[in-house]
Design a protein with these regions (language model features):
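Bacterial N-terminal signal peptides that target proteins for export
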Residues: 1-6
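Active-site beta->alpha N-cap acidic-glycine motif
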Residues: 21-87
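Hydrophobic faces of well-ordered beta-strands that scaffold small-molecule active sites
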Residues: 24-28, 48-50, 73-77, 120-122, ...
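N-terminal signal peptide c-region/cleavage motif recognized by signal peptidases
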Residues: 15-16
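Terminal interaction modules at protein C-ends
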Residues: 20-22, 191, 195, 238
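C-terminal alpha-helical cap/extension of soluble enzyme domains
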Residues: 198-241
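Substrate-binding cleft of extracellular glycoside hydrolase catalytic domains
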Residues: 66-116
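Catalytic domains of cell-wall/extracellular-matrix polysaccharide-remodeling enzymes
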Residues: 97, 101-192, 209-226
């Protein structure tokens, strides 16, 4: 009996490498402007999640295209940054100075933009994600629609994790930006770091952008992932984080 059990376990170990697989989620942010790069992002191999700006010119069409291609769509919700110098500000962008009525209208209109959406992430938002009342409204509206929240972590002082826990909203946070430095050498290093983190903790989240160099890189790399790394949608990683109480 013991020998039979041992052989069964050994067979599983030998023939089921996925038993020990680690999870990696890759998100392509800022879709909605370039139709060509948007479609290239969606056409990347595997379970890539695409974050689409709600009111960009090609946002609705790209969301529909992503659904046809069996990709996961999230709403990339524009939020106020601490500094908007030399940065393009989307219109409309949630702003801490807005009236409650204006804020609510923009929030609800944005979150209703794509019926296909599974989640919400913050576009910019280094200021707003630190503010209690604005984030409570965002997370409440997110939860009411059955969506998860991906924190892009544009601020190390983001309170999204704690507020999501209190609102019982599924939550996950970015671990790495792939292309803040756009060289292939840097992107290879980021991918390697993500593999290491995934093997250590069980998962990792990378955010990239629809730059030509990034897409060229991912088209190659995603076809040659290590055998112990599983590419997954962000929704497969989200949790109602029980450890978030009292955390910033």
């Amino acid at each position: 009996m013991r020998r039979s059990l041992f052989l069964t376990v050994l067979t599983l170990l030998v023939y089921s490498p996925s038993l020990f697989s680690r999870q990696l989620a890759i998100v392509i942010d800022d879709l909605g402007y370039s139709l060509v790069n948007g479609k290239r992002s969606i056409d990347l191999p595997g379970k890539v999640t695409v974050a689409i700006l709600p009111f960009a010119p090609n946002s609705v069409g790209l969301a529909e295209y992503a659904t046809r291609k069996n990709k996961e769509v999230i709403i990339h919700l524009p939020m106020q940054a601490k500094s908007e110098i030399n940065q393009k500000t989307e219109s409309p962008t949630l702003n801490v100075a807005m009236s409650t009525i204006q804020y609510t209208i923009i929030l609800n209109t944005s979150l209703s933009r794509f019926a296909q959406a599974k989640g919400v992430s913050n576009h910019m938002g280094s200021l707003l994600t630190e503010r209690e009342n604005p984030m409570r409204q965002v997370l409440s509206a997110t939860g009411n629609r059955g969506l998860y929240f991906l924190d892009s972590k544009t601020s190390s002082q983001s309170i999204a994790k704690r507020v999501a826990h209190q609102a019982k909203v599924p939550y996950v946070a970015r671990d790495f930006f792939l292309d803040n430095i756009k060289s292939e050498q840097n992107m290879k290093s980021i991918m390697s770091n993500a593999f290491t983190l995934s093997r250590k903790t069980g998962d990792a989240v990378i955010i990239g952008h629809p730059y030509k160099g990034t897409l060229d890189f991912l088209e190659r790399e995603l076809r040659n992932l290590p055998t112990d790394i599983d590419l997954v949608f962000v929704s497969q990683l989200t949790t109602i984080d029980q450890a978030a109480v009292g955390l910033p």
